[in-house]
């Protein structure tokens, strides 16, 4: 089976996961910006960082997929992937980006990444600061697990990358 790993990463955690996955599976790995035609592949594994409710690089991957090319989507974000509310938010983000008929036959996995505020672009720092100030004083019952995590990690560097979390994905593509 001819397979390819594609990753869309802004600050590096998604790239780290994709490259480690490539080592574990011995599959080739490319940045989403390099994607052209994927119709020659039996399956594509797309690792995408979650940014502002979107999976980075997924739109380009979806446009390049062949009619019979299988798809596995791996999201990487700051939110706790064991929290059901966070998972529902991620699934909703995917539904906004990918057609339902495609998602029905796509395996989806979620990994926890990290953030280092010192490395954020000016635009992303401004967005995160605005978001932080809009949620920090919300009543506790209105805060989601995602907003709590953002408040706790604001202006710091955190790294939740856990390569052991790749094991179920490795098994799924063998």
Residue ranges of predicted features:
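N-terminal beta1-alpha1-beta2 submodule of the flavodoxin-like/Rossmannoid cofactor-binding fold
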Residues: 1-67, 73, 171
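FMN-binding flavodoxin-like domain, especially the glycine-rich phosphate-binding loop
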Residues: 53-174
């Amino acid at each position: 089976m001819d397979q390819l790993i594609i990753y869309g990463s802004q600050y590096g955690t998604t790239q780290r996961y994709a490259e480690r996955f490539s080592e574990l599976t011995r599959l080739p790995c490319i940045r989403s910006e390099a994607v052209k035609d994927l119709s020659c592949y039996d399956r594509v594994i797309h690792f995408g960082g979650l940014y502002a409710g979107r999976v980075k690089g997924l739109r380009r991957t979806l446009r390049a997929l062949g009619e019979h090319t299988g798809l596995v989507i791996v999201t990487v974000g700051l939110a706790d992937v064991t929290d059901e509310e966070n998972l529902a938010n991620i699934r909703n983000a995917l539904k906004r980006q990918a057609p339902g008929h495609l998602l029905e036959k796509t395996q989806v996995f979620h990994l926890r990444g990290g953030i280092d505020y010192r490395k954020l672009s000016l635009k992303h720092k401004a967005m995160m600061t605005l978001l932080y100030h809009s949620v920090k004083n919300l009543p506790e019952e209105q805060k989601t697990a995602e907003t709590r995590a953002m408040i706790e990690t604001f202006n710091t560097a955190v790294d939740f990358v856990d390569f052991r979390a790749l094991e179920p994905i490795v098994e799924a593509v063998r």
